[in-house]
Amino acid sequence: MKSVSLKLGVAAIALAGIAASSAAFADDESSIGTFSATASVASDYRFRGISQNDKEATPEFGINWAGNKGFYGGVWAAKTNWGGNTPSYETDVFFGKHTDLYGTDLNIEAYYYSYPDAKSAATSSYYETIVQLSHAFGPLTLTATGANSPEWSLKGGVAWYGAGTAAWAVNDWLTISGNVGHQWVDKAPKEYTHADIGATAVWKSFSLDLRYMGTDIKGADCSGFWMATKKACSGGFVATVNYNIAKLF
């Protein structure tokens, strides 16, 4: 479950990066693409507003591949703590494609969330298809996200997700962004809404994201979302420091 904080913070420059990468690869169709990496430390790991690590600090690592014609993929890992089911870490694999639709970026992604050491690893892990549309209006980038899982974690049944994101590039190093999303899970005690707002500052290969995240889930219902301890759904500030290696090879 990739942390959304940094993704939101850099949303305003993402389309420009995609366009530049596509142009570079168009000049060399034989290229196998490029590999990059990220390493982060976050004060909490939140996925769609819910803490995945019992509101404790967590390291996060990722390796990304950017290929020809908008194709991309990668792996991502982070420390987790769900309480009773206690997986100690999460390892995700994803693959997708960006397509330019007259200035609007269409991103279709297949995403697999894996929890290898969970007590019920086979049913904890699950798959999601994610579709995003992003468009830049000068310094403002708007993104709409939709996702579906045919079988949510721990046999939660069919799940749907929708979200809207706005990111404003104040200058070349500071972005202010916010996100509102809604999650439906068939066998969860209720559907819920989450939101966050914050800012991302970039300096060379480093970035700092400061963000407030919260949900409308009451404490008594929080543990019903399986991937959470009872206090994981309450709001809080999250700080993330990220280091990006632009090109491994």
Where would I find each of the regions flagged by the language model?
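Cleavable N-terminal export/targeting peptides
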Residues: 1-34, 246-249
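Short glycine/proline- and aromatic-enriched beta-strand/turn motifs that initiate or cap beta-hairpins
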Residues: 27-81, 95
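Residues that define the transmembrane beta-barrel architecture of outer-membrane proteins
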Residues: 33, 55-59, 87-91, 104, ...
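Repeated loop/turn-to-beta-strand initiation elements of outer-membrane beta-barrel proteins
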Residues: 35, 69-75, 102-108, 138-144, ...
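Residues on the lipid-exposed face of transmembrane beta-strands in outer-membrane beta-barrel proteins
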Residues: 39-43, 61-67, 93-97, 110, ...
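Transmembrane beta-strands of outer-membrane beta-barrel pores
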Residues: 41-47, 77-81, 99, 112-116, ...
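Detector for outer-membrane/organellar transmembrane beta-barrel domains
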Residues: 122-187, 212
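Outer-membrane beta-barrel "beta-signal"
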Residues: 197-207, 212, 231-249
